[in-house]
Amino acid sequence: EEYKGVYVFAQQVDNELSGIAFELLGKAKELAADLSTDVTAVLIGSGVKGLVDQLAEYGADKVIVVDDPELKEYRTEPYAHALASVINEYKPEIVLVGATAIGRDLGPRVSARVATGLTADCTVLEIGDFPINPVPNQEQKHNQLLMTRPAFGGNTIATIACPDNRPQMATVRPGVMQKIDP
């Protein structure tokens, strides 16, 4: 399997990490443990190397830093290019992005560039089999990211998988996942 690892887009604004980065790292740690893999934070910005230790404290095993003066302020095109380039080079199995104003802009553009699906506004993320219940004449795949989100106006929930494409990408609203204490 050439795709490996759980990656988190570590959002920062004005060289300060957003709370969602820590929440996603907490969830990524759980998912990575289930997959026997590691957690990588992707930090994009200008002069952001000072944030690396904080990401490590909150669960990142590795941090990939894309540091360039052009990336000082969030702009769609340069950030999408940076994150898509990291995904294409390192081939993560899972990529988590916060469903913030930045993440909602960035996530869909990046998933389109790397030709994979994106499940937005997930409330539950877990590793499991898909289809969840075996179906005759259909292979049940193991170790899939099962992404649960509200559907149809929030009256029901849907659990979505992306069995045939990698990475599996999800956005998660702030406040849904728990950060781990360093």
Which residues does each predicted region cover?
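N-terminal glycine-rich FAD/FM-binding segment characteristic of electron-transfer flavoproteins
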Residues: E1-P182
